[in-house]
Amino acid sequence: MIPVILSGGSGSRLWPLSRKQYPKQFLALTGDDTLFQQTIKRLAFDGMQAPLLVCNKEHRFIVQEQLEAQNLASQAILLEPFGRNTAPAVAIAAMKLVAEGRDELLLILPADHVIEDQRAFQQALALATNAAEKGEMVLFGIPASRPETGYGYIRASADAQLPEGVSRVQSFVEKPDEARAREFVAAGGYYWNSGMFLFRASRYLEELKKHDADIYDTCLLALERSQHDGDLVNIDAATFECCPDNSIDYAVMEKTSRACVVPLSAGWNDVGSWSSIWDVHAKDANGNVTKGDVLVHDSHNCLVHGNGKLVSVIGLEDIVVVETKDAMMIAHKDRVQDVKHVVKDLDAQGRSETQNHCEVYRPWGSYDSVDMGGRFQVKHITVKPGARLSLQMHHHRAEHWIVVSGTAQVTCDDKTFLLTENQSTYIPIASVHRLANPGKIPLEIIEVQSGSYLGEDDIERLEDVYGRTAEPALQVVAGSR
């Protein structure tokens, strides 16, 4: 059995903590490990092979770093140039394996779900395996225990032809209003759609070709034209752009006669909203969940997430407060699904707060935007031991570098030299330059940019060990380097 872990979402409903360039699956929202790391660790038992990962190309360095940090293995990482939903993502994964002569059972898992009961998860997986081995396409259904309007529902019924504990899917139901959701719970036999599946690779491709040939044909061509770099598979962008955007549910599961459901009662949560974050955390005597430097007085059933500043909440009930360095979100717990509308409005205004945090992670380290004005920007840059930035130049800005700690190797035009703590240098406009850390401890510098234009699209990469010379820089204030 091979897990296929889908890591391509943007997590906009958990803004402002989740950003497009660092979405929720890569955040530690429910413990010390990120949701992505938890998902992989959950699969460490007999019979489970290393996972096949699917993620956005922009997130490849985050994925590799989080794997390395926990010494986690993967057999390949499929890099999507842009999202086309789950049906194409799984199609390319299945096609890759079948082409290699590995027609295995595929366990399809989103990278951002929480499952608290590992034993119950494995028991449900054993039931699903019995059905999938017989050619069925299994969906893991969460027994509908309350009238939830944020999930799609599955109606199931008994089928004597299926193994014990497995039911036939009768119909899929879109996210209902509360009245209809109450009817489903009262009637029984309804499940929330978890978005987790188990089926054989060839079975999925057979059903996909039958029910959505456009996705099948486009994905096959995109894979054939893909570029391989070690365990990275760069899916061909020009071909993939033509692929229809569709989910596994719409493309296959709602149309096939082989869809069945296995109940999963394992403390599942898709962590899809701030109210879900409140659900999965331990609460104080007044039902409050707090994180960070937070003071709560005479408040009940609130979620308060601080990220640096002191946050004080007084006399509130059922309120969510999330503070980050550059944004704050306050909402009633019943309205947190509407965060997506705020994100849409910010995107329409071209605001950078939906793209990056002030602290931006890169394959070489990170930088934090400390201050910014009309003709200047100040950054705190950290470079990992042995790492180096791209060889680059800027046409409209100069830079001043001051070493705070560690040793910097600086290239500026035809000169290469070392700087140590409290030393500084000046990089003129249009100079070809590079910053590297030759030492064994992190390098920290303060960078002061000045010039007529400070946009991060003013970067020309001439050489890059991370293969980014052909990629356009992000045209947002918090830039790319």
Swiss-Prot record:
It comes from Pseudomonas aeruginosa (strain ATCC 15692 / DSM 22644 / CIP 104116 / JCM 14847 / LMG 12228 / 1C / PRS 101 / PAO1). It comes from the Bacteria. Pfam families: ManC_GMP_beta-helix, MannoseP_isomer, NTP_transferase. Co(2+) (for PMI). NCBIfam families: GMP_PMI (TIGR01479). GO terms for biological process: alginic acid biosynthetic process; GDP-mannose biosynthetic process. PANTHER family: MANNOSE-1-PHOSPHATE GUANYLYLTRANSFERASE. It catalyses: D-mannose 6-phosphate = D-fructose 6-phosphate; alpha-D-mannose 1-phosphate + GTP + H(+) = GDP-alpha-D-mannose + diphosphate. Pathway: Nucleotide-sugar biosynthesis; GDP-alpha-D-mannose biosynthesis; GDP-alpha-D-mannose from alpha-D-mannose 1-phosphate (GTP route): step 1/1; Nucleotide-sugar biosynthesis; GDP-alpha-D-mannose biosynthesis; alpha-D-mannose 1-phosphate from D-fructose 6-phosphate: step 1/2. The gene is algA. Its EC number is 5.3.1.8, 2.7.7.13. Optimum pH is 7.0 for PMI activity, and 7.6 for GMP activity. This is Alginate biosynthesis protein AlgA. Monomer. GO terms for molecular function: GTP binding; mannose-1-phosphate guanylyltransferase (GTP) activity; mannose-6-phosphate isomerase activity. Its cofactor is Co(2+).
